[in-house]
Structures are given as C-alpha cells and as structure tokens.
Amino acid sequence: MCSHGHSHNCAAEHIPEVPGDDVYRYDMVSYIDMEKVTTLNESVDGAGKKVFKVMEKRDDRLEYVESDCDHELLFNIPFTGHVRLTGLSIIGDEDGSHPAKIRLFKDREAMSFDDCSIEADQEIDLKQDPQGLVDYPLKASKFGNIHNLSILVDANFGEDETKIYYIGLRGEFQHEFRQRIAIATYESRAQLKDHKNEIPDAVAKGLF
C-alpha cells in the first residue's frame, strides 16, 4: 500500500440523488486544458485524463482510470480560462472500487498528495453510481471563478484500488486569461499596423 503522508478531519457533505437522466449538462470538458491534466497514482500513465469525456460517452466502459498501489487518486485539472463550476458527476462500478469520498481544491496547480493535508474547499461523500444519475452541487462561494481544480479521491467502498469511468463537470466559461487576451490584442493591433497603408487616411488616424 502506498503512503502519501497526509491527513484530514473535515466533515463531508451528503448529497441527495437526482431523479431521472440528463437533468444536468456536464459539458465543461471542452474548457479543460487536456494536455496539462495530470493524475497521480494512476496504474496506467495518461489514463486519468480519459475519464473526462463528453457527456454522450459517459457510459463508455472501454476507457477508465484505476489507482495503482492503493485507493487514492489525485486529479489536477487546468482550464483554458476562468470558469464557474456548479456541479459534478462521477461514474464507477457498483462494487468496492467505486470512489466513496472526494476532496476538492481550487487554483492549486500541480498538487501532490503531501499538499492535500490542507483544508479542502469542499468535501463530498459519494454514492455508488454506475449510471451517472447523481449530481453533486459545488459551493458557489468557492468555485465561482477558478482556473484549476484538483480532485482527491480519498476513499472508496472497500477495494484496494479505485476505478473511475467518468468525471463530468457542469458550469460555464467565464473569460480567458488576461495574459492571453493581452497577447491577442497586441497581435491584432500589429496586424492592423501591417496593413496601415491599405486603410484610408481618415480611418487610419482613428486607429493609430
């Protein structure tokens, strides 16, 4: 068994099941910077990022992540800009490998297991949910404007390893990073200057 060297004592939240299917849209996957997603303690390198699928493929059992030497998994999920997250869904098997508890941390890039000894922004007790019918709301005060999410799977339902098929995030994109906006603005102005001679004088004076 691995020893990651962290502890916690915060009370987790109990979330009721949401009846019916497709009650929420978990479509924030398009705003995840997938190339930079990392998963610690995954048994197969690169498997962790594959559980962030489009909602229509959430029932796919061919791609999944399984923990390596104990039940813990730590996902570091950067976004392509600032986002507001309002809820999540997690699909596993209906057995002891399904995650039972997660701890969420916002805007802490490249977290390690040692970093998880700090207080989480939210803790959630999970239900065994092989069909993705349970929605777990996230705290608006904590996840209203973030650029990175870390998810620690802190416990499962009794197996040595944890297996996850799908993690869906719902919310909305807020805005791009300021640095990226500044670069785009600079490049746009540079292109205009390159074509200055093609712009009538009256218009050019108003632009430059």
Curated annotation (Swiss-Prot):
Query: GO terms for CC?
Result: cytoplasm; nucleus
Q: Which domain of life is it from?
A: Eukaryota
Q: Which residues form the PITH domain?
A: 17-189
Classification via Pfam families: PITH (PF06201)
Gene3D superfamilies, per the entry: PITH domain
Q: Which family does it belong to?
A: Belongs to the PITHD1 family.
* UniProt name for this protein: PITH domain-containing protein ZK353.9
